[in-house]
Structures are given as C-alpha cells and as structure tokens.
Amino acid sequence: MSEARRGIFPFSKIKLMLASPEDIRSWSHGEVKRPETLNYRTLKPEKDGLFCAKIFGPIKDYECLCGKYRGKRYEGKICEKCGVEVTTSYVRRQRFGHIELAAPVVHIWFLKSTPSKIGTLLNLTSRDVERVAYFESYLVIEYPNEEEEEKFEKDEHTIPLNDGISTKWVKLHVVNEEEFEEKYAFTIDEKYEHGMGAEILKEVLSKLDLDAYSRKLKEIVKPYSIGFEDLGKEIEQKYKNLYQKLIKVIADDFRAYGVEIKGLEDHGLSLEQAIHRILNEELYLNVETGEISLEDCGDSCLTGRDALKEYYERVREHKKDIPIFEKIKEDIRSTVLREISEARIRKALRTLQLVEGFKKSGNRPEWMILEVLPVLPPELRPLVALDGGRFATSDLNDFYRRVINRNNRLKRLIELNAPDIIIRNEKRMLQEAVDALIDNGKRGNPVKQNGRPLKSLADYLKGKQGRFRQNLLGKRVDYSGRSVIVVGPELQMHQCGLPKIMALELFKPFVYRRLEEKGYATSIKHAKRLVEQKTPEVWECLEEVVKEHPVLLNRAPTLHRPSIQAFEPVLVEGKAIQLHPLVCPPFNADFDGDQMAVHVPLGIEAQLESYILMLSTQNVLSPAHGKPLTMPSQDMVLGTYYITHDPIPGRKGEGKAFGTFEEVLKALELGHVDIHAKIKVKVGNEWIETTPGRVLFNSIMPEGQPFVNKTLDKKGLSKLITELYIRVGNEETVKFLDRVKELGFLRSTLAGISIGVEDLQVPKAKKKIIEEALKKTEEIWNQYVQGIITNKERYNRIIDVWSEATNLVSKAMFEEIEKSKRIENGKEYPGTFNPIYMMAISGARGNRDQIRQLAGMRGLMAKHSGEFIETPIISNFREGLSVLEYFISTYGARKGLADTALKTAFAGYLTRRLVDVAQDITITERDCGTVKGFEMEPIVEAGEERVPLKDRIFGRVLAEDVKDPYTGEIIARRNEVIDEKLAEKITKAGIEKVRVRSPLTCEAKHGVCAMCYGWDLSQRKIVSVGEAVGIIAAQSIGEPGTQLTMRTFHIGGAATAQKVQSFVKAESDGKVKFYNVKLIVNRKGEKINISKDAAIGIVDEEGRLLERHTIPYGARILVEEGQEVKAETKLADWDPFNTYIIAEVGGKVELRDIILDVTVREERDPITGKTASVISFMRPRDAMLHTPRIAVITEDGKEYIYDLPVNAILNIPPEKISLEWRVCPTCSESEETTIQHQYYVVKDLEVQPGDILARIPKETAKVRDIVGGLPRVEELFEARKPKNPAILSEIDGYVKIYEDADEVIIFNPRTGETAKYSIKKDELILVRHGQFVKKGQKITETKVAEIDGQVRIKGRGFKVIVYNPETGLQREYFVPKGKFLLVKEGDFVKAGDQLTDGTPVPEEILRIKGIEELEKFLLKEVQMVYKLQGVDINDKHFEIIIKQMLKKVRIIDPGDSRFLVGEEVDKEELEEEIQRIKLEGGKLPKAEPVLVGITRAALSTRSWISAASFQETTRVLTDASVEGKIDELRGLKENVIIGNIIPAGTGVDEYREVDVIPAEEKVLEEKKEPKEGS
C-alpha cells in the first residue's frame, strides 16, 4: 500500500504473529481472577470478575463505579475507593484482560491442524502429541552417550535441543503408563528425561535449536534435486552410495549405445572408474578421439561433466541411431527419484518449511503453548439483562467461566499438594476448557447447552455467519431502504421514481440543512419537528435536495456489475419505487412483486462517480460480451415489429408518394394512409419504397442515419443499437432507446394486439404426420422383433422418428399460420399478423417451441436421468392432454423445480470461488511492453466452426503485425486495437490465426496492463487503469451460470432432441480437398473412409480454405478429391447410431477367443426372440484371460487383427457360426485343471474390403442443458482429474502395440501339448493372442517357442510404446482392457496426442505440451460449455481466471534462493528472488509451471486476510501466524476487510493525488472571509 493510499490508517502492511506470554500480559489491563460476571441485585460488575470495571473500564461515560467521580473534568483519574479509571465507556470494547494459567496449555489450533504444527516440529505423529498433551502418555527424551553422539546426529528421527551450552541430538519416545513403568521409570541416569502434558512439550519446544535443525533437513532434501549438472566431488562426499549408482547408470548407457572411452587398459581402469575420475576432474578426456590422459592435452582435452557430454555429442554426430544426451540426463533423474523415497522427502520438506517459517518470522516454537490466556474485552462478549430478571449472554462468557473455575481449582490443588493423579486430571480438564474456548468441537464432543453447541472464538470467525463474511465483507449501511418495484413507463432512462416518504427518510440530514439555509427553521431541533409534521416547506426543500442527487438502485441477487445502477430520483406518490422498463434486463427484474434497495451516495465524490460511471445511461453495453444489455423488450419490441412489418397489398393510400417524413406522418395521423400501406418517400436524393410505419420508426432515429427499411425484431433492434452506439455514441443511443420505448408502447397499444384461443391453429397436416411417425415406429419395432437391430438402436431410432415428427408438426403449424388470412376490425391481414405468431417471431414473448407446445404437439419429454421417454406427448395444450400425457408432463415440471433449487446454490458457490481467485487483478498500468501474445484461431467443434475468428479477436490488441498471406502487405500493425471493421478485414484476407495480446502473457508486475486486456467491453474503448477486471471476469462467468440453472424450469421439461447429424454438406462453392482421408472400396463400389482423424475441406481458386468438416471412421465419401462442388452438395454420410469395425482388406475370417458365456453373451430379446452376440466379460477375471478378436487373413498369409471392445455386436451371419467345445489353455492353466469352453467358429467365410465385421451402438440421445455443463466448468476450473482420463503420448514417435501379460501359453490343439513362459515386467511380447507359431519362433527377445501351436495370452491390456528413431527416446504406456485405443500399430503420433479415448487431463497437457497449449485447451473447453447454451462470454474473462490458475511455479532446484525444493511459489516471488540473486551473483533457482484449481489458488494467495475470509479460516490463520506472514494489502478484499479505500477505480494511486473541491463551497468560503473581519 503506497503512502497515498493509506487513508486513515497509520500502517501499510499487516503481519500476523504468534503472541508471546509477555505480549499478552502487555495488552492486558489486569488479571481476571473470579468467574463471576454481574451482581444480580445491583447489576454492577463483580470486582476481578469477567466484567470488572477496574480492569476493563467504566460502564457509564466518565463515571466511576461507586459514583464518587462524575463528569469529564475528572478524566484520567483513578478512584481510590473502587479503583476504576474515569474515562469513556468505549474502552470496554478495547481493553483486554488476562488469566494466568496454573499450568501451560497447548493451543489446539497448533495441535489439531492437519498436519499438526507441533507434531511436525518434534517429528511425532499428531496422535502422539495429543496423547502427551492430554496426559494419556509420557514423553521420554533420550539423550545420547558420548559414543552415540555421531549416530544420533545422523539419525533422521532425532531433533536438536540446545540447553544453553551446547546442542544435543535427542530421540523422543511417546510411551503409555505400563511401558513407562517397565522401561524408564526406574532409570536414574542422565540419559532419559520424561514428563507429561503441555509442560514437557513447552520445555522441548523452547530448547529446539532451529538453525541446526534447518541445516540437517536441507541436507536430507538436497539429493532430491540432483541432476547430471550437479555431479562432482561435492556430491560424492555427501551421498557416496547414490553417486556410485549414478556413475553406473552413465557407464551402462555408454556401453549400450556403443560410446567407448579409449585407453582404459593402459591406465588399468574400468569404465565406471574412468567416468568417476573424469567427473571428479582427476582425468582428462580428449573429446576428439575419446582417449583418456592424466595431463591436460590441449584444447580438445576437457574434464568434469562437460567432457562426457561434449564427447557423447561428438560421437552422436557420426552415429545417428544413438539417443540424444537428454536420455542419459533422464536416466540419472529417474535413478535419483527411484533411490530416494518420496514420502521421506515430503515429510522433511514439510518440517523444513515450518522450521524456516519460525526462523524468518522471529516466532518462538514454545509460544504455541499458552501460559497466559487473553480475555476478550467485555463489550465484545456482552451480557444483557432481559425483562423478568433473566440475562442473555454471549457463549464466550460460559467458556471463560469454565476456564477460570478449573484454573482456580488447579491452583488450590497444587497449593494443597494433592496426589499427582488428581492434579493431572485437573490439568487435562483445564486443557479441555481452553480448547473449547478457542475452538469448540475441534477435539472430542463440543460443549453444549440445551443441545446446542456453544460458539467458540473460532466459530465467531469462520463461515458465512463469521466475523469475516458477515460483518467485514458485507455490512448493512445507513441511508438505504427497500420497497416493491412497479413499472415507470413515463420516466426517462436516467430516472427512477422514488416514493416521497422514502425520500424524506433517506435525505433527512440534507433536508434539515436546506430548511435552515432557507430560514424555515431556526435550529436542527426545529427542522426535525417540521419534518415530523411534514409541512409544505419540507416537501419544497425535499424537491430541491433530491434534484440532481443520484441514488443507487440494487436488486438482489447482485450477480454482476449492472445489478447496481445510479438513477436520478423523481419524487412520486405511493409507496413503490418506479423503475424504467428498459433497465429491467440488466437487473433481471420483473414486476411480479420484486423488491429493490435504494442507497444514497453521500459525499460529493461519491455523487460524481455515481453520475459519471454508474448512471443507467452509462451501462447500455454488457461488460461480459459488449452487446447491448439495456434493451427494449416485450411490448416495445412488439410495437416496433408491428409498425415495421412488411407492407400489406391493397391498403388505403397505396402507391402514394411523399416528399418528406413530415408529410407521411401528417397523412398517417389524419388517417389518409394505412400504417402498412406500400408508399414511396424521398430520402435524400432517392425515392424509397416503404410503409408509413417504417417512416414512423425512422423519424425517431438519430439524425443522419441511413434509412432502416426492414422488419425489426428483437435481434434486429439489438444489432441496430450496437451499430448506433458505434456510430453516434452513448448519449444519442440512450435518447433513441427512450424514443423507441415511447413509440413501442404507444403502437402496440394502438394495434390492439391480444391473444385468444382461436389464434392457436392446430395444423391440419398433424394427423397425417403422426400417422406416418407411428407407422415408422412400428417398422422399427418389426426390425427389432426380427433381430435386425438391438434394443438400444431401436430406442435411438424411435427417438429420432419422433424428433423429426415434432419438427414437421411445428413446421406445418407455422406454415399454416403464415398462410391463413385473418380479418381484424373489418380489414384483411396476412397470417403473419397472428398475435401469438408475432409475439414469438419478434422475440417479444415466448418462442417457437412454446407455440409448438400450445398448438402443435408437446413432443418428447426427458426423464430425470436425461434420457427421453420414448412415447411422446402427441397432444398439445389447445387440444388438451390425456391423463397419461398429463402424468408424463409432471415429470419435466418437477425436474425443473428441483434443478433450480439445487443448481442455484451450485452456481452461486462457483461464482464465489471465481471472485475469490481473481479479486486482486486490476489494471495496474497502461502498457507492460511485452512482445509475447496469445494465438487466436476459430473454435471448431465436431467439424463445424462454433466461434468465428472475428468474434474472438474483436476488442483485442495485436501482438504482432498482421500480413496478408497472399500479397504480403501489412493489414494491421502491432499494438493496434481490432474493432469490427479490422476484424472483418482480417478474416476476409483468409487469415486463420492471429496473435493478440492477452492477460495470459501480460508482464505487468501486479495485475494486468491495459494493452494486454484490450477494450473495456461495456465502454468500447481501451480499459482504464484501475478497473477491477478480475471481479468483472468472475461475474461475467458466474452470472450466466446462475441464470441458466434458473432457466431450465421455463421450458417445462419438454425436450427437443437434436435430430442426429448423419451427413455433411458443403456450405460454399469450391474444390474438394481431403485431409488424412484413407479410402477403401466396398462390395457396392462405395468409398469408405477408414481413417480416424479424416476431414474434408472446401478451398477456393487460390487454395484458401473456406470450410472444413471432420469425417468419422466408416463414413461413405460421396465426392472425389479435387472435384468442383456447389454449396449444399452432400460430401459424406454415415450411420449416426453405430461405430463400425470394418475389414480393411479381403480375406478369410477367423474368430479368436470369442467364447459363449465367457467373452460373448447372447442377448436374446424377450419380445423378439432373436439373439445378438454381444461382447462382454462375464467375470472380471475373463477380461484378463481372454481377448476377443476377429482376424482377417489375406491370401499371402498376412493377418489383420481387429480387437472387439465391450458392447460390440458381431456382424457375422448366424448360419456361418457354429459352436465347438475346446480345451481353454489359459483357464485350464489358471484353475490347474482341464477346462473346456464353447468357442465360436466360422467356417470358410470370406470378407471383402469395407465389410462390416462388428458394430458398437452409440450412447443413447440425452438432453443437454448447462446443468450438465456446470460440473464440467467446475471440473476444469478446479483442475480436477476427469472421470475417464485419456492417455496422452509424451513424445513424437511411432506407435508399437504389444500385449501386456504375466505369461504366454502355447497350445497345440492336435497333440494337446502346452508350453508356458512367464514374462518379466519389462519384457515385450512379440506375438499376438491367437496367432499360430512355429517351433523356434521368438516369443520375447529372450524366449523362443519350444513347440508349434496357437498363442494364448492372459492379457491385462496393452503396452503401447511410442518410439522416436531420431532422438532415440521412447515411452511406454499401459492401456487396461476396456479402454479404446485411438491409434494403430505404426501410426505416427505427436507429443500430446491422445492414444486412448477419454478426456485429457489438464496437468498432462501442461507437462507434455507446455503452458500455451494448456491455456488454449482450457479456454476452448470452457467456452464450449457456455456456447452450447448460447451464452456469449468474451475470452478475456476466462483468460484472467486461467492466468490465476497458472500463477504458481514449483521449485525443482532452489539454487541459492530462499525457496525449498518442491515448494510452490508465485511467479512474482520467483522473479523477485531471481533479480536479487542475479545482483549477488549466485546460482539461480529452477522451476516448472503448475496448474492449481481455483479453490487452492484462492487459499494460497499471498494475502492471508483474503485467504482466511474465503475458506478454512482456522488453517489459513494458523499457517500464517507460524510463518509470520505479511499482508501487503494489495488486493480488494483485504482492503475492504480492514476498512480501507480499495485499490481499484478511483482508489488507485494515480487518482488519489487529485483533490476535488465542490464549486459552491468555494464561493461560500470567499463570501465568509470579509464577514469575519467586519
């Protein structure tokens, strides 16, 4: 916090520390010795009690307790009689007392936090420390003898104690009574010390030698970060064994890759010894020849690590097939990690962090044990007398009473020399009493009263009702009121109607002042009386005061910034606030009983800011997406739609021509021309054919705007408003909006539009459509009964039929409505004037779906699970529903209500986490000057462009020049802002990727710079410094979440299943281009694609890509490469309900491991009696023992193997399949007895390329709404691992697939011989399951088949190996059975490509592909969830949240920094540390980026105040106090909490220097001066 922003506080940072006993005593004003509170007769506080006036101060202002001194003149005097200081009673809120504890007590927060702080320091488990603290066990300290000292020092489990003379390493044992009696009770020697309770813990903690401890722990964790760069003498001395192993790794690698070091025999050395001596710089290596020598032999002789690396690189230049040197480095790292137990290092790191925390902060460990307990000031734990002589008290008083009682009893027992066991029990009870006071229920059962747990100090801080969230972050304020809202159509947009009675109350002080100024009242008291009597003068003054004094209106829930706006009040009669109809959408307000709150900004600055920044006219555009928020709706839309409707032929005045708008309006007013007549009017120099209605609309347009000659619906209006905003600016647009409101209301009223049952026309074609659909479903049932399709397919197809039928009915209905003429008021109108139709089409109310339900058919309904009920509701609301249909309908309605309730809370919590993680991001500077940028490309999902490039780059700043890819001319320069025109220009030039500046790459030290952020979308200009963009981002993402979850219930659960896409058409003319398309031709001569990632593109003459569509595996391709096509040409089609397994070659078919009731179940359908063979494992074991496959063997004997995943259905004609009993070698072997199975066998079945071998039915159609989407958003933001994670390749390379099994069996069916081979973990199996092998054929690299026969493998799954021949790197992945492989043997994959199905894990993407790819992935995934719902949110908001998720790095090698290995620190902190070390010239730390979920990111923020007010208050405060954390007060939350001006908006340093002097006061001051002199 800078000097300027300190405001009223004499500090700029806040540090949290442990309080030492001396501190506590120094705060205290006296010791509380008695548990009494007030005297019940006199109601005066008892002396030395919990409310003692002597300790805490007087009860009445300036009056001592006995009444001897009264009045301000005695201030500061201490009464001799009662000992009370005469001062204000306010000190009772400030003065602490204290209790001297008779025995030390452990502070429960440091005992029971996970992991326990005391436990971590003493190297004991948390349970052990607890047992000692609660007198269940003894703590025995074992000191070393002289001969044991070195052993103890090396032992990991010892801790250093310093007795003031020297440091000794000791062991701690926690033993129970019996063990203690047995082993230690009678040993008198100095070797053991023992004790119980907090005393012994305090003793040990106070003796702890932190420096020695820290040194030892650093040694333990050091080897964790050893890499090739660290090898040398230094490491050897400390870690001999490890060093030897690492040398062996290097030697082994050198041998394996044939890198030889020459001259070993001459020196009598082994390779290991030579490498050892080179690393220790005792030998020289000639990197040219590979000779070793004892002397330096010139330039080409090197020694140490560099010699080995350099020599290896030279050898690799000649031998390309050996891996790059990175491979050796990797081997060294993996050996280090293998040798060192991770858990041990983690534990040491935790302890080290804690020890370092104590060292840096200046806290002492023994302060975690309390000797003195502070007592809260009495006003903060009040005791109030109720009527009837009862008292209401704060729970804390009960706790303090119990502590004092127990403490006094303990003192008495100690004085009486009571038996040890009694004293121990009393000490335990004291410990428990203090625990309950600090954190009730943290250990054991909470202390209750009348069955309610009492609230302890911790409870007063944490949770929604705690101090932080209830009283510091959200306060109730004065000068506010709330009332119901009603519509105020005659208001202007910047006004609101404020009830007079409310205004009088809100503006009271202003009214008093005005009454005095005008001489109506002589004093404030007099003014008060006038206001109470409500005299006419009062109303006059109120009018003057309210004029031009803005008020803030707020509607809860306040989901985003526009939920609070400023208005100028207009005084109205009645008791309801009047709201302008245009500002309803941003508030999400309607007038069915909503309430709103009014707040009065008091200061002149506050009023100014309300006017300039918060006035409703300044909030036309949404900060989330930059489109208008303040929009005409309902009647206003309907009115404008009605008057701008297409002309109706044959109306009065048709064909007339008018010279000016005025003439048209005059004629319209006099009734000479009908509002929908076709007329001509002169605009500028040309004649335009239009209608009087459209002229009327254009007459309210701002001057100089082009003539709008089209029907305007809601979308059209929105677009128009945006265009006007760009062209004429804010002020004119607002005036126009107000005129639209007037016109819309007026015209929709005059049109007399209303709805009647007659307007709902049930289409005549409905009956036929339904009959057709029923016929189709019957056919599908028949196919199912004959066994042609499975139950799942039947379901999918029926759903499809009904979706289509619903769409047809709805289409027919709209067509009929449009065609049927109407007679209104004796005039004939076309069908498009049907009121219901107009309302829906114009976007005024309702939508096509709702009309379809009213007059078409309700259609399919969804179940709770999200599937559709396959019998649709055929009736509509006009015809009425049958009982069954009504019953089915209730489903959806209930689901809607239940969802709403649950999801609102969920969305609210998501918003809260987002706000917390991003709250401290503000715009801190104009330009950070970075050259980095973020690459933007259109978002493409399933082959279609979901978000075009121009929408993504609009409002951003370019990070580099944009050149035309064809001409090379520069279209736009770096640091230019992209507006709509430029965005359009860039996309027209055929540019696919643009690098823009982004918050993700911004290099501003704190927050983000204005250039990287780009436009403030609500103002359409570069964002100003000080804007709280983090909060805006969080609200923009959170608000639609809440909105959408609330919206489910409006549709009433009638689901519209998307008709499944089963083909793709060209959208534009051009040439066909194939991407990765692999074709085979099937029996029918059709071209079938068998590539997994194929796409078809359309390019124009110059070869620019116009569109691109992904084509699934098994699709039929209908065009040739290079073919010229017109738009709407079908390019490919496929079966949307199944995935196929297709024979890619022709040949004979063999079935392998397809065994009845083991790997195949015959699904006999109860209804159809037909069976389908479905792959599924009957027992989990079968999945290990068998792998069902189909093999196709070509004429030249090559095998093509197709694995059958679970749920695959065999597509082989039943007559070709027979069952045979055979011995199953794998089962027989595992059960150790002969077991036979029924195998499926195929007799001479030939297939041709393109034949379908099996099909896998797809998941059933489900209803998609954001409810499914919100958990996905949460999963992404919390960086959770998805349910079904995909396996990604870590390197580029070629795929090899091997079986993964413990053993291979070869079985000869003729002789019945079997041979078993057990397979080691890292051996690769070279044969496939079911393959025939000859004797002598290799099974693995080392094992050979001893007999002819068929291979049986007990597979667990597959080993997929990715090998890169160029670098020599390889990675292997285990793919379990049941996971679907997306790659085939021999495919080339890139790093980060998916090898299996599933959702990629964000952390993997970060590790493999790096930060930018991860950012792209997260951004696209989250955007898609919202886009599916049609919610528009600008990328920059997501980028800010993602920036916060990636702000941490993990230290791999600390170098000379203050960090520890494995510690997660902010990038900023790392940067600061690197700068410091560069100046001092030390070794720089190394770090890797980490991805942190939003909850963790919010908790690990640098500000402890902000973290504590978010979640897990206790833990945050405990950690912060131990480390002595300093809060720099940079973010918004921490400043709100301490009551400071927040560092955003006008609270930024830049603006704080400016002073505002109101003009009036200046004048008054000048006038006053001569007065004083006169």
UniProtKB/Swiss-Prot annotation:
GO MF terms, alphabetically ordered: DNA binding; DNA-directed RNA polymerase activity; magnesium ion binding; zinc ion binding
Residues involved in Zn(2+) 2 binding: 928, 1002, 1009, 1012
Binding site for Mg(2+): 590, 592, 594
Record-listed Zn(2+) 1 binding positions: 64, 66, 79, 82
Any one GO BP annotation for this protein: DNA-templated transcription
EC supergroup of this enzyme: transferase
Disulfide bond entries: none
Short name of one Pfam family: RNA_pol_Rpb1_1
Annotated function: DNA-dependent RNA polymerase catalyzes the transcription of DNA into RNA using the four ribonucleoside triphosphates as substrates.
PANTHER family reported in the protein's UniProt record: DNA-DIRECTED RNA POLYMERASE, DNA-DIRECTED RNA POLYMERASE SUBUNIT BETA
Family under the similarity heading: Belongs to the RNA polymerase beta' chain family.
Protein's UniProt name: DNA-directed RNA polymerase subunit beta'
Organism: Aquifex aeolicus (strain VF5)
Lineage: Bacteria, Pseudomonadati, Aquificota, Aquificia, Aquificales
Gene name tied to this protein: rpoC
